[in-house]
């Protein structure tokens, strides 16, 4: 077993996720159900725990009740050892205010760092879908001798303008960090690719503290990790890019190696689900060497198919009953019922949904506890759908939580 340095992991989970509305109308973005049996935050927490980092503070703020409950129930590391995954709301330790940016969230939580006295601090986002061994990034960070490391994923330059982009020299030292540039910088070894920031960072502890305290003094700062703190280290030639493609996750395949998705929009959220349901999926949830952990479905019996109910090229979670209906190219979360003659195709169905007899659901996302009445149709007539629901640019119909159609 490898020896790990003294590390505190901080997960930024206070995001509102406006672009995922209505899925984020009643919950924080990291609490949005994903992949049938998980929530978005389960991916980063699984990566940290699988790597052996067991002191994790999850900083929460926006509509965090379901997220807090999930962390306490699904991620309870109780026992005699000093390990924990703790949900930490805004403490107002530096004034009567809530978190004002991601850097301010960590600033207000400096007591956690002072108490733990780690040598290094990992700061990861909570709402991306991927597998990664963070210990490999920490090892490379230590080897560089620099104060800050930023995980970068290689994306085509033609698509990189949507991201924070990294320009680095041949040694991996970051020379420029720019948000959503019109002309993204190339990687040192490929003129057609750009390093896009994944929002995952490793810091030498005292250097991070100094940067946060300096940023606090700047009244013009947005107090943002990517917009302010990382440029602070870049200006001092103390930032290193960690190439995500160099990360070797046990059990990964050539097809899903390096998979990472920002699911911040309805279309990207939908597409990430479709990535999982092929025979040879782009993202493989069935890698037992690096599992994605969750216990949301622990109290449900196995899925059941009766009266010629079928599911093809789909993932169906425990507790589902497909009774005479047909499910194709879809992801069904726990406790979904599909009645006789109903068709669900190319859709993402969140927990507790009821789909009535003869109903049709196509190219849609149904949030928790939606009831689709007998014979109702969703995703067939776009004009009609736009009158009733949100329809994304890509044509995905989204029905909000607890709605009856």
Curated annotation (Swiss-Prot):
Gene3D superfamilies: Hexapeptide repeat proteins, Spore Coat Polysaccharide Biosynthesis Protein SpsA, Chain A. SUPFAM superfamilies: Nucleotide-diphospho-sugar transferases, Trimeric LpxA-like enzymes. GO terms for molecular function: ATP binding; glucose-1-phosphate adenylyltransferase activity. Alpha-D-glucose 1-phosphate binds at residues 99, 164, 179-180, 197. One of its GO terms (biological process) is glycogen biosynthetic process. It holds the Pfam family Hexapep_GlmU. Its EC number is 2.7.7.27. It is an enzyme of class 2 (transferase). Keywords: ATP-binding, Carbohydrate metabolism, Glycogen biosynthesis, Glycogen metabolism, Nucleotide-binding, Nucleotidyltransferase, Transferase. Belongs to the bacterial/plant glucose-1-phosphate adenylyltransferase family. Homotetramer. Involved in the biosynthesis of ADP-glucose, a building block required for the elongation reactions to produce glycogen. Catalyzes the reaction between ATP and alpha-D-glucose 1-phosphate (G1P) to produce pyrophosphate and ADP-Glc. This is Glucose-1-phosphate adenylyltransferase. It comes from Corynebacterium aurimucosum (strain ATCC 700975 / DSM 44827 / CIP 107346 / CN-1) (Corynebacterium nigricans). The gene is glgC.
